[in-house]
Amino acid sequence: MPTTENVARDFTDMLRHGQFQAAGEKYWADDVTSVEPMNLPGGIAAVVSGIIATKAKSESWFGGCRIEDICIDGPFVTGDQFALFMDMVIVNRVSGEGRSFDEIALYTVRNGQITEERYFYD
């Protein structure tokens, strides 16, 4: 079974290569919980639980935006968690407008899978 460090490094490498949804699908546990600081556009709740709801949240987000550029610091691993600092440019698919977006993401790993992802941004 992969360690938290193994998961963190592979997951982060996938993100760096633009494989955002594939990284989630590879590592999300069936009972994953995803936590945002606020509700998302499209009626997506700030907290969703389960792999189906988390995939739907991800598909909704990537349906409205694309990541044009990303710089990731980390992973910073402690115990069963790892954190990433992500600095990116996201582009609205409808308007074509881009903006800088920074976030901290904290992931909890159990049995080689991500059981919680928690995002911090304003």
Regions found by a protein language model. Name each.
Residues 69-76, 88-89, 102-108:
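Hydrophobic/aromatic beta-strand elements that line small-molecule binding cavities or substrate pockets
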Residues 28, 88-90, 105, 120-121:
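Short beta-strand segments enriched in hydrophobic/aromatic residues
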Residues 102-122:
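Short beta-strand edge/turn micro-motifs at domain boundaries
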Residues 79-81, 111:
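Residue-level signal for tight coil/turn positions that link beta-strands
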Residues 6, 21, 25-79:
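A solvent-exposed, acidic/Ser-Thr-rich amphipathic alpha-helical stretch
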Residues 64, 90-100:
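Short, cysteine-centered beta-strand-loop-beta hairpins and adjacent loop/turn segments enriched
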Residues 1-18, 26-27, 55, 94-95, ...:
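Terminal "cap-and-tail" regions of soluble proteins that handle hydrophobic small molecules
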